[in-house]
Regions:
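C-terminal target-recognition/interaction regions appended to catalytic cores
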Residues: 220-353
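Basic/polar N-terminal segments that are highly enriched at the extreme N-terminus
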Residues: 1-3, 352-353
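Core alpha/beta nucleotide-donor-binding catalytic domains of modification enzymes
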Residues: 2-117, 127-131, 136-139
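Class I S-adenosyl-L-methionine
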Residues: 66-78, 88-261
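Short Gly/aromatic-enriched secondary-structure transition segments
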Residues: 45, 188-190, 294-298
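Short, small-residue-rich loop/turn micro-motifs
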Residues: 85-87, 177, 283, 312-313
Length: 353
């Protein structure tokens, strides 16, 4: 069926989930996020978000009845509610994350699901949400939505299995309203071919030496690196991290005990012939991970990071360097969102038949 199913995206960020769902055949009626620059990014891309209403809003301020009325919908009529509540509070890498107020955004999102009663919903988050920090919050919220009449599907997906040139594990929870006796949704099957870093970004020309944008490719520029950081990159082959640095190039903290201090892939180069590591909100610095270019003596550019997240090459991002890196690193990879969206659309097609 070619029916366009209606969707609302909460916590839309720069629009990775939105764009993937659009590519899967959904009509995004409305999206919102608390980040001003993220909404500006969506509005700066009319090529990809036609007739798309996006607003800066806090989910706690979104009144469900008013939202549905503004979209000419009643409770129970929406096809899909999508959302990936900010996940930093569930990250196993963050000290003090147990107390992060954002942990409770999952509960608020589920309360919106129960009030809106979409036919289906998506909840995407980091695997840590199923661990010590998130398990109680998540299971309590899912129990409520299950009691309200939903089948719950829960699985950890790796983006590299769905056309994303990146190793990125995420919990993808899909809810399916119990309008029929048995659940219909099935997760997408992993693809055999994994897209490598070489396949994804090797075609890009080298950015200008002076740190300016490439004249034909926005956000494709190099950071200035210290002489020592350049020497570190020169000492590494593609796919190597700080474990391969000679002692004189190790950071002082790593000299104390390289085996127990810090992450082992910092100060590293990406591999050419494998998928990239997870693109984080700080991917613009190779001191934060294996984010050095495979062969050029620089960190990967913002544009390269966006491509590794499967955003189109001409996708516009609004904000300064830090803001754009955060938007890219926090996004749901477009190709993975599309793969899940296609399966949800198949489920809705079966529903209508």
């Amino acid at each position: 069926m070619n029916k366009k199913y209606k969707c609302i995206d909460c916590f839309c960020g720069a629009g990775g989930l939105c764009l993937g769902l659009i590519q899967a055949g959904f009509d995004i009626l409305y999206s919102f996020d608390i980040e001003v620059k993220a909404i500006a990014t969506i509005k700066a891309n009319p090529k990809y978000f036609k007739n798309h209403k996006a607003e800066t809003r806090d989910i706690y301020d979104v009144e469900t009845a008013g939202l549905l009325e503004s979209l000419n919908l009643n409770s129970g009529e929406l096809d899909l509610l999508a959302g990936g509540p900010p996940c930093q509070g569930f990250s196993v890498q963050r000290i003090g994350a147990d107390l992060d107020e954002r942990n409770h955004l999952v509960e608020e999102y589920i309360s919106k699901v129960i009030a809106i009663r979409p036919k289906m919903f998506i909840l995407e988050n980091v695997p840590g949400i199923e661990g010590k920090r998130g398990k109680n919050i998540l299971h309590s919220a899912l129990a409520k939505v299950e009691e309200s009449g939903y089948f719950i599907h829960e699985k950890i997906l790796d983006a590299q299995d769905y056309g994303v040139p990146q190793r990125r594990r995420r919990v993808v929870i899909v809810g399916e309203r119990k309008d029929h006796k048995f659940p219909l949704f099935e997760y997408p099957k992993p693809q055999e071919h994994k897209i490598t870093v070489r396949e994804a970004i090797a075609y890009l020309p080298e950015p200008p030496e002076d740190g300016s944008d490439h004249p034909h490719i926005s956000l494709h520029r190099r950071d200035r690196l210290s002489a020592k950081n350049i020497a570190r990159l020169q000492a590494l082959k593609p796919g190597q991290g700080r474990d391969f640095l000679p002692p004189e190039l190790l950071a002082d903290c790593h000299k104390v005990s390289s085996k127990i201090i810090g992450h082992r892939n910092v100060y590293g180069r990406m591999p050419w012939d494998d998928v990239a590591p997870t693109i984080t909100a700080r991917f613009d610095s190779f001191t934060r991970g294996m984010f050095g270019h495979p062969e050029q003596n620089r960190s990967i550019s913002l544009r390269e990071g966006a491509i590794l997240q499967t955003f189109p090459e001409d996708f516009v991002f609004v904000g300064n360097k830090v803001e754009v890196a955060r938007q890219i690193g926090n996004a749901v990879p477009v190709a993975m969102a599309m793969a899940v969206g296609i399966q949800i659309k198949k489920c809705l097609d079966k529903w209508n038949n």
